Every structure is written in C-alpha cells, then in structure tokens.
Amino acid sequence: MKLGKVERLLRSRVESGEKLFLLLSDPEKPISPNTVKLFEENGADVLLIGGSLNVTPYDIDEYIARLRVEGVKLPIVLFPGGLNNIAKSADAILFMTLMNSMDPYWIVGAQVAAAPIVYRLGLEAIPSAYIIVGHGGAAGHIGRALPIPYENGYIAAAYALAAEYLGARLVYFEAGSGAPKPVPVDAVAAASKVLSQALLVVGGGIREETLAAERLKAGADGVVIGTLAEKDPEKALRSSR
C-alpha cells in the first residue's frame, strides 16, 4: 500500500531530523479550537482525535468542522477507540491493531469491520500497531490488553519488531491516558534499536518537559500529548519542545 499524504508528511519530517509532536484530543472533552491553534503555531505536526466510548462519528465531524472554521490547518488523524470513532471529515486514520490484547476482536475483528468503512470514506489508512505498556489505563481495560511490565523493555521491543515484520508503519507505545508514569526509556531505546522502517511514537504519562525529552533522546520519533494539553496547555507546549 502506497504512502498517503499525511504519512509522507510525517516521514519527511523525521527524515529531515525533526521529532514529531502529536496532539491528542478526546472528542468527549475536546481541546478548544483556540488551544489547538496555539499548538499548531508552536510546532504540532498532527491532531489525533479519538479514544472515547461516548462519541459518535457525527460528534467528531462536528468538532472537525469547528476546528476548520476557526482556521486550524493541521492534518487531522483519527485515533479510533472503536468503530464509533470513524468519521469522514478526517484526513487519515491510524489503522491499528492492539498487539497485546487477549481479545481477538481488538487484534483483527474490529479491523475487519472497519476496513470497508475506511475504504468507502476514502480515508488515508496508516498501518499501525498499538502496544500497551505498564499502567494501560482505560485503553488497556477496554482492549483487554495484557500490559507489558514497566521493567521488561525487551518484551516491548519484541512486540514492536513483530509489528514491523507484520507490516506496521507506525508503532505506538501507550502507557495509558493519565498514567502515573510514562513508557520506560529502556523500552523506547530497545524498540528504536530494532525498528528499521516503522515510526515509533510514545504516549501516556508525559507530564514534564524532561519526560518527553528523555524518550525522544532514547529514539522515539515522536511523543503524543493529550491529558496535559487539556489541563495545562502552557506546560504541554514546553513538554513538546
């Protein structure tokens, strides 16, 4: 499958030596358009939307429409928590498999149900692997994941490598929304060492500038900032740099 416009943009930035900043907005408690514009002006590369249960595609389309009316030009990528998060007005979707789920539905069942919808809507699909590490949060609970222990970074790296061998072009290490601590640096470093093509992004529990910087230095291609952006935009901006 050929690279789409959004994925080409992300890869071109990484290839030029930049690190990615992915802003995450939950459509149930969305980040305001003005705040999204602030992040856009300060280097955000894409806006991820999704992850909530209590949301319909209409809610997401309405939110995207508000963002565009307010002048937000960032590429908008769906970060689906389920079929209810697939909306036609997005630019792309992280077409994800939850690699360490114990439930086949989250490994392949949801993807089979989603594929015809994504195709029909003409969304750019970015083949992605979602891997829950440590705390896991709501994503780990809903997805029936067997979270990788914080102290076993080599297991996270093995999952990442398996994902790349299976065709994933983006690997997303997730500690969980609002997690007490982020994905460990050694897990990021181990995965970065074995991945040759897939982009590696890390999210969950990143509350300080140093936490983001450490993971980027360890080899992550980008960080995902969500809860912090909702609660303290200024601090989130510092963490993304």
Curated annotation (Swiss-Prot):
Gene Ontology terms: cellular component: cytoplasm
Residues binding sn-glycerol 1-phosphate, per UniProt: 172-178, 204-205, 226-227
Coiled-coil intervals, chain numbering: none
Cofactor names: Mg(2+)
InterPro entries: GGGP/HepGP_synthase_I, GGGP/HepGP_synthase_sf, GGGP_HepGP_synthase, GGGP_synth
Sites where the protein binds Mg(2+): 26, 52
SUPFAM superfamilies tied to this protein: FMN-linked oxidoreductases (SSF51395)
Catalytic activities: sn-glycerol 1-phosphate + (2E,6E,10E)-geranylgeranyl diphosphate = sn-3-O-(geranylgeranyl)glycerol 1-phosphate + diphosphate
GO molecular function, one term: phosphoglycerol geranylgeranyltransferase activity
EC number: 2.5.1.41
Pfam families: PcrB
GO biological process, one term: glycerophospholipid biosynthetic process
Principal subcellular localization: cytoplasm
Gene3D superfamilies: FMN-linked oxidoreductases (3.20.20.390)
Pathway(s) where this gene product acts: Membrane lipid metabolism; glycerophospholipid metabolism
Location of this chain's protein in the cell: Cytoplasm
Keywords: Cytoplasm, Lipid biosynthesis, Lipid metabolism, Magnesium, Metal-binding, Phospholipid biosynthesis, Phospholipid metabolism, Transferase
Top-level taxon of origin: Archaea
Function of the protein: Prenyltransferase that catalyzes the transfer of the geranylgeranyl moiety of geranylgeranyl diphosphate (GGPP) to the C3 hydroxyl of sn-glycerol-1-phosphate (G1P). This reaction is the first ether-bond-formation step in the biosynthesis of archaeal membrane lipids.
Family statement drawn from the similarity comment of this UniProt entry: Belongs to the GGGP/HepGP synthase family. Group II subfamily.
PANTHER family: HEPTAPRENYLGLYCERYL PHOSPHATE SYNTHASE, PTHR40029
HAMAP family attached to this UniProt entry: GGGP_HepGP_synthase
Protein name: Geranylgeranylglyceryl phosphate synthase
Organism: Hyperthermus butylicus (strain DSM 5456 / JCM 9403 / PLM1-5)
Phylogenetic lineage: Archaea, Thermoproteota, Thermoprotei, Desulfurococcales, Pyrodictiaceae
